[in-house]
Amino acid sequence: VDNGSYGTIRMHQEREYPGRTSGSDLFNPDFAAFARAFGWNGEFVDRTEDFEPALQRFVKAGTPTLLHLKLDTDVITTRTTLGAIRAAAQRA
């Protein structure tokens, strides 16, 4: 799962210094391409509706598989977003 950031660090930065983050963004390589280069199945998924079909293909394949899931950076946990943390910190 790839949200393009050091999530916990980013969360603390937004809480303590809203809107002023530093060094928490990641620019990851194409991990699915790496997997394919080594003979594995590899697929990049960045839309929710594409996840289940990709997962089903790989379960049926029965071979080593890497599924690179790209999430929105703002989705930091299942309960909150970076935007909500930033807004709460700005109100405080």
Regions found by a protein language model. Give the residues of each.
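Thiamine diphosphate
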Residues: 1-92
